[in-house]
């Protein structure tokens, strides 16, 4: 009798522990997905903000200024490089004349 009661309690506890781990797993996956969406949204907003090139036509000045839209680094002015992900001219971390 005592063994059956212990066995029943043990099974009940195992089920509770399994449910607790499943709940933690669901929370972890949900948290990761939420963080991923936040990062994607931030990148999309930054790209949208700076994708429109409101500056002068690049043919008029020969190069694109800071945050101007580009496809390759050669389109950007001196000390600027075309950002791989957002496709705008960003500082290339060089200093000089």
UniProtKB/Swiss-Prot annotation:
It comes from Cyriopagopus hainanus. The presence of a 'disulfide through disulfide knot' structurally defines this protein as a knottin. The keyword Disulfide bond applies. This is U6-theraphotoxin-Hhn1a 4. Expressed by the venom gland. Keywords: Disulfide bond, Ion channel impairing toxin, Knottin, Secreted, Signal, Toxin. GO terms for molecular function: ion channel inhibitor activity; toxin activity. Residues 34-61 form a propeptide. GO terms for cellular component: extracellular region. Belongs to the neurotoxin 10 (Hwtx-1) family. 12 (Hntx-12) subfamily. Residues 1-33 form the signal peptide. It is found in: Secreted. Its main location: secreted. Disulfide bonds join 63-77, 70-82, 76-89. Ion channel inhibitor.
